[in-house]
Regions:
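The substrate-binding groove and active-site-proximal loops of carbohydrate-active enzymes
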Residues: 71-94, 110-120
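Active-site-proximal helices and loops of the catalytic beta/alpha 8
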Residues: 3-17, 21-23, 31, 100-103, ...
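Core domains of carbohydrate- and sulfate-ester-processing enzymes
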Residues: 2-81
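Aromatic/hydrophobic pocket-lining residues that form the small-molecule binding cavity
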Residues: 91, 95-98, 126
Length: 173
């Protein structure tokens, strides 16, 4: 596990006293300890998080349920979920960090990215990031998991995805 030189971890430089700030990488549940409604275990390696962060499935609470994606964290792509405002100019720090991650893996010779739940990330990010990756790695494919047929075109034409998939029909057959 070697981080590329000059790349900062997510959260470095964040203001954890702000639920939302355009250049924070995370959404913080300020002044609250992560306290799920189920046991995460105990002992010397018990998990502790302060302040709590929003989960990957948009649970903006320090008290997620076992059905929330408590093992993931919601990245801040510049959307203030408190009022719905979007802050994409200047480009948010998370966008730069994510495109660095995409380029890192592309440099390892992978042939595609399967991007889960893409509709939970602004299409504007994908429309910015995918062309940047394809500048140097034009062969690489981007495959999007998406379920709302009403936004398929947006993710193809504005998000620049090569393929979309909806696995609901796979599970429901």
């Amino acid at each position: 596990d070697v981080k590329p030189q000059g790349i900062e971890d997510f959260g470095v430089g964040d203001d954890p006293n702000m639920m939302f700030a355009p250049n924070n990488n995370f959404y913080y549940i300020t002044r609250q300890v992560f306290s799920p409604h189920f046991d995460l275990g105990s002992g010397k390696d018990a998990y502790f998080e302060f302040p709590a962060k929003a989960t990957g499935n948009d649970c903006f609470s320090a008290f997620p349920s076992v059905n929330d994606w408590y093992e993931t964290v919601k990245l801040n792509y510049g959307v203030d979920y408190g009022n719905g405002s979007r802050h994409f100019d200047p480009i948010p720090d998370t966008w730069f960090k994510m495109v660095n991650i995409l380029r890192f893996w592309a440099s390892k010779g992978i042939d595609a990215f399967r991007c889960d739940m893409v509709f939970m990330v602004p299409v504007e990010f994908w429309g910015w990031a995918i062309p940047l990756v394809k500048e140097k790695y034009p062969h690489i494919k981007f495959i999007a998991e998406i379920y709302d047929v009403n936004i398929y075109r947006d993710y193809i034409y504005n998000g620049h995805f090569d393929y979309l998939y909806d696995k609901v029909s796979v599970y429901d057959t």
